[in-house]
C-alpha cells in the first residue's frame, strides 16, 4: 500500500454534502449546450495538469475547492445521462498524453539499443511510467482526501458501471478509467484496512436494517426472518473500513449444520434445532449468501478476503469444524438453456439437448413438442408443479447444468460468475443439488438447482493457482460424471 501511509486517515468515508438526486429518466439524452459548456469549464478547472517530470514532487496540490467544485457539480446532476456525459468527457479528454508516451517509449528503446548503464535506463523507464498515468487519476487522488471523498468515488464508479451497462457511455477510454478507479479502490479497501464484524440480534438496528435491505441472494422477508439469520446455528459477518467501523461493505451469511446442506429452504425457512447451540451438532459451515452493499466496489476482492477471514474466525470458535462449503445459486442457467432451445426450435427436427427417450417422456406429460413447451414452462417455473414432469427433467437438467458450470467458458474461465468467483478462491466444484431452491426466483433463474463449492483448506492455494494460471477446474466425481453424460448424450 505504498503512497498511502498516515495520509489514509484523511480518507474519511463520511457522507458528502451535495444536493440529493431526484429521480429522472434513465434513457440516453444529450446534455444541453449550456450544460456541456459548464462541464468542459469545470473539468478544465478541476483536473490538475500533469507537472513536468522534474517538478512532479515540487508542484503544490490543487486547491481543495477545485475538487469540491467537481463533487458538488457532479452531485447536482439529476439524470444518469448527464452523469454519464460528464464521466465520458473526463475519460476522453483527461487521460494519457499519447504523444508523451510515444516519446518516452522511443527514448527507452534507444537507450536499450545503446546498452547504456542501468541508472540511465531505469530513469527513462520511470519517465515512461510517469507518462502513462492519466490526468484524471490526479483528480481522483485529490478527491479521496476530502471528507467523504472515498465514498463519493465508490458511488461515482457505481454510476460509471451503470452507465456502461445501459450503454449511456462506451468506448476504450471509459473502460480504462473504470480500471484505473477500480485499482485505486482496491488499494484503499485492501484487507489491512478492513475490520471483520459479527452481526447478532443485539447489533445496532441500522446495521440489521442495512444488511436486510442489501441481501441480494435470498431476500429477507421480515424482522423474524432476519432474527433467524443471525440467531443460533447461524453466523453473519461483514467487513467495514477502518475509518467507518460498523458500516457494512460486504456481508457473508453462514449456516452451521450437521453436514453440507443441499437445500436453501432448510436454511432460510426452517427454525434451528434448538435455541442453544450444541457444538456436537455442528460439523459443517455453509456459506449461503454473500452480498456487496456498494456496487462501486464490484471487482474489488472483498468477498474473497471475507471468506478467508470468516473461516479463521469459525476455526477459532469451533476447532473441530472440518467442512467448509458454499451453497450457491446458478444465475444465468435458465437463460442459457432457453437460448439453446430457441436456436434449436428454429431448426425443425433438430434435437441436441435431450435423448429420444427423454423427448418422448417429456412430450407425454406436456402433450406438446418438447422445445416449445419447455420454453414456457422453464420461463415460468410451472414445470415444478408436475411431479411427473419434474422427474422426467431431472436427468437432462442435471447434466445440462453440469456442462453450463464446467464447460461453458468466457476467455477460458467459467462463464457463470458465481462459479468463477469460488474457483478463483480455490474451491472445488463439488455437488449439484436437485430442487435445492424451490422459490420462484430459484426456479426461473436456475431451474431450482444449486451447487456446492467446497473449500478444502489445504488445497485452496494450489487449486486457485491452477485455475487462474492454467484455467483448470477442479471438480468432484459427481460433476465429472454429469459432464461425461452430457458429452455422450448431447451434440453441442
Curated annotation (Swiss-Prot):
InterPro entries: Malonyl_CoA_deC (IPR038917), Malonyl_CoA_deC_C (IPR007956), Malonyl_CoA_deC_C_sf (IPR042303), MCD_N (IPR035372), MCD_N_sf (IPR038351)
Activity modulation notes: Malonyl-CoA decarboxylase activity does not require any cofactors or divalent metal ions.
Keyword Secreted set for record: no
Active site, UniProt feature: 328 (proton acceptor), 422 (proton donor)
Keyword DNA-binding: no
Pfam families: MCD (PF05292), MCD_N (PF17408)
Top-level enzyme category: lyase
N6-succinyllysine PTM positions: 167, 221, 385
Residue range of the transit peptide in the UniProt record, numbered on this chain: 1-38
Subcellular location: Cytoplasm; Mitochondrion matrix; Peroxisome; Peroxisome matrix
Tissues/organs with expression: Expressed in liver, heart, skeletal muscles and adipose tissues (at protein level). Ubiquitous. Strongly expressed in liver, kidney, heart, skeletal muscle and adipose tissues. Weakly expressed in brain.
Positions contributing to malonyl-CoA binding: 298-304, 328, 422
Annotated site, Essential for catalytic activity, chain positions: 210
Protein keywords: Acetylation, Cytoplasm, Decarboxylase, Disulfide bond, Fatty acid biosynthesis, Fatty acid metabolism, Lipid biosynthesis, Lipid metabolism, Lyase, Mitochondrion, Peroxisome, Transit peptide
Main location, first listed in the record: cytoplasm
Chemical reaction(s) catalysed: malonyl-CoA + H(+) = acetyl-CoA + CO2
GO cellular component terms, semicolon-separated: cytoplasm; mitochondrial matrix; mitochondrion; peroxisomal matrix; peroxisome
Motif Microbody targeting signal boundaries: 490-492
Domain of life the protein comes from: Eukaryota
Known EC number: 4.1.1.9
Region (Catalytic domain): 190-492
GO biological process: acetyl-CoA biosynthetic process; fatty acid biosynthetic process; fatty acid oxidation; malonyl-CoA catabolic process; positive regulation of fatty acid oxidation; regulation of fatty acid beta-oxidation; regulation of fatty acid oxidation; regulation of glucose metabolic process
Location of region: Alpha-helical domain: 39-189
PANTHER family: MALONYL-COA DECARBOXYLASE, MITOCHONDRIAL, PTHR28641
Name the record gives this protein: Malonyl-CoA decarboxylase, mitochondrial
Organism: Rattus norvegicus
UniProt lineage: Eukaryota, Metazoa, Chordata, Craniata, Vertebrata
Amino acid at each position: 500500500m505504498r503512497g498511502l501511509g498516515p495520509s489514509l486517515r484523511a480518507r474519511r468515508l463520511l457522507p458528502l454534502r451535495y444536493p440529493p438526486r431526484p429521480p429522472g429518466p434513465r434513457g440516453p439524452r444529450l446534455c444541453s449546450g449550456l450544460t456541456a459548456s459548464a462541464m468542459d469549464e469545470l473539468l478544465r478547472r478541476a483536473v490538475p495538469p500533469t507537472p513536468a517530470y522534474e517538478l512532479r514532487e515540487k508542484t503544490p496540490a490543487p486547491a481543495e475547492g477545485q475538487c469540491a467544485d467537481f463533487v458538488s457539480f457532479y452531485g447536482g446532476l439529476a439524470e444518469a445521462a448527464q452523469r454519464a456525459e460528464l464521466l465520458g468527457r473526463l475519460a476522453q479528454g483527461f487521460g494519457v498524453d499519447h504523444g508523451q508516451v510515444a516519446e518516452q517509449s522511443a527514448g527507452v528503446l534507444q537507450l536499450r539499443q545503446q546498452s547504456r548503464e542501468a541508472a540511465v535506463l531505469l530513469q527513462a523507464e520511470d519517465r515512461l511510467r510517469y507518462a502513462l498515468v492519466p490526468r484524471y487519476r490526479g483528480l481522483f487522488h485529490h478527491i479521496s482526501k476530502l471528507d467523504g471523498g472515498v465514498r463519493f468515488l465508490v458511488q461515482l464508479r457505481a454510476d460509471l458501471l451503470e452507465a456502461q451497462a445501459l450503454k449511456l457511455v462506451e468506448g476504450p477510454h471509459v473502460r480504462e478509467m473504470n480500471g484505473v478507479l477500480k485499482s485505486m479502490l482496491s488499494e484503499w479497501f485492501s484487507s489491512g484496512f478492513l475490520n471483520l464484524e459479527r452481526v447478532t440480534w443485539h447489533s445496532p438496528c441500522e446495521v440489521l436494517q442495512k444488511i436486510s435491505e442489501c441481501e441480494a441472494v435470498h431476500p429477507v422477508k421480515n424482522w423474524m426472518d432476519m432474527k433467524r439469520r443471525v440467531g443460533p446455528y447461524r453466523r453473519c459477518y461483514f467487513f467495514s473500513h477502518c475509518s467507518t467501523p460498523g458500516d457494512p461493505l460486504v456481508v457473508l451469511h453462514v449456516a452451521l449444520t450437521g453436514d453440507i446442506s443441499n437445500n436453501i429452504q432448510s436454511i432460510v425457512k426452517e427454525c434451528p434445532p434448538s435455541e442453544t447451540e450444541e457444538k456436537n451438532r455442528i460439523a459443517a459451515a455453509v456459506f449461503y449468501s454473500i452480498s456487496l452493499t456498494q456496487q462501486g466496489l464490484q471487482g474489488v476482492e472483498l468477498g474473497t478476503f471475507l471468506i478467508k477471514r470468516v473461516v479463521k474466525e469459525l476455526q477459532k470458535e469451533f476447532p473441530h469444524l472440518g467442512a467448509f462449503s458454499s451453497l450457491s445459486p446458478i444465475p444465468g442457467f435458465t437463460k442459457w438453456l432457453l437460448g439453446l432451445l430457441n436456436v434449436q426450435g428454429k431448426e425443425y427436427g433438430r434435437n441436441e439437448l435431450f435423448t429420444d427417450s427423454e423427448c418422448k417422456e417429456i412430450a407425454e406429460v406436456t402433450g406438446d413438442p418438447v422445445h416449445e413447451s419447455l420454453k414456457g414452462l422453464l420461463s415460468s417455473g410451472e414445470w415444478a408443479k408436475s411431479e411427473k414432469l419434474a422427474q422426467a427433467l431431472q436427468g437432462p437438467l442435471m447434466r445440462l447444468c453440469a456442462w453450463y458450470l464446467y464447460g461453458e467458458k468466457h476467455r477460458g474461465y467459467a462463464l457463470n460468475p458465481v462459479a468463477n468467483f469460488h474457483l478463483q478462491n480455490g474451491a472445488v466444484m463439488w455437488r449439484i443439488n436437485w430442487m435445492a431452491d424451490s422459490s420462484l426466483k430459484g426456479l426461473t433463474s436456475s431451474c431450482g438447482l444449486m451447487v456446492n463449492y467446497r473449500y478444502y483448506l489445504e488445497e485452496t492455494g494450489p487449486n486457485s493457482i491452477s485455475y487462474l494460471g492454467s484455467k483448470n477446474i477442479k471438480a468432484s466425481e459427481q460433476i465429472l460424471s454429469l459432464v461425461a453424460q452430457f458429452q455422450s448424450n448431447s451434440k453441442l
